[in-house]
Amino acid sequence: IASCLVGSEMCIRDRLNVISRPLVRLVDRWLPDPYIFVVILTLLVMIAAMAIEGHGPMAVVGMWGAGFWELLSFAMQMLLVLVTGYMMASTPLVRRGLERLADLAGSPGTAILLVSFVSLAASWINWGFGLVVGALFAKAIARKVRVDYRLLVASAYSGFIVWHGGLAGSVPLAIATAGHPFEGAIGVIATDRTIFAAYNLFIVIALFIAVPLVNRMMMPRPGEEVFVDPKLLAEPEVADTPGTTPAERMENSRVLSWLIGAAGVAWLVQYFAGSGTLTLNVVNFLFLICLLYT
């Protein structure tokens, strides 16, 4: 039975390699940076406005310039999602936790499964958090287990697939926030109808099962792996220097952070006790308060 299982796994792995290698070459050759998509889509919309709606070129440019900053608040919210997620992932508490989790990876297969699952969980919590946690965890595992580094990094970023069904999904949280740009058309839609809806949770659970298994099946054959020198992934030691002046001691003191953090915790408890729902502002505020205690 064991030989049959091993043989079927190798067969699946070979088929996945046959499918994935042409796709990898296609993406490497033809997939540009996201900025290029922004420019192309902007030009396509401008052309459509002139061809379909009959607007002149200068009228289209005028509308584009006038509306350029209308999404400034939304852009700031997205920036805070990324910044707070990055800061949380970079805290010593999270880094120590990732190092301990990396000790559980006793084999290359386990390493791929583990980094995929951790990346999925972190991305579901916050997509900015997941982007950084996945990369840091892949480095932590590569320092301890000899595993194909290409697949390890790909697995670390594959968890990003669940971000829009997670707690920091931009559209679900945006339409749950009063005053969003499309409130006049669709109203305010609470997260119990989007993020926490049964169909969305089913998809997320299915991805938590499928993505690690697919990544595990894509492991290259022996002799085809690409390894990285663990010494290149060593984390620099950051010295914790105590303040020598009153200003530096105040800056390094946790007391002020804990006091303002306590006010933030009190507000969050009051908000959710009053049947408050998740919104972009609440998620960002929650991460900011958590950062004050880490």
Where are these regions (language model features)?
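Membrane-core helix-loop-helix motifs of multi-pass transport proteins
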Residues: F137-V226
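Short, hydrophobic transmembrane alpha-helix segments
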Residues: V27, H55-G56, F272-T277
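Intrinsically disordered, low-complexity non-transmembrane regions of multi-pass membrane transporters
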Residues: S8, R13-L26, M217-N252
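Membrane-embedded alpha-helical segments and adjacent helix-loop junctions characteristic
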Residues: S20, I40, H55-K144
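Transmembrane helical segments that form the transport core of multi-pass membrane transport proteins
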Residues: E248-L292
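Lipid-exposed faces of alpha-helical membrane segments in multi-pass integral membrane proteins
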Residues: I40-A48, L114, V118, F202, ...
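Alpha-helical transmembrane segments and their helix-start/interface "positive-inside/aromatic belt" motifs
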Residues: V24-V38, K144-Y157
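Single conserved hydrophobic/aromatic residue that forms the stacking wall/gate
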Residues: I1-I12, Y293
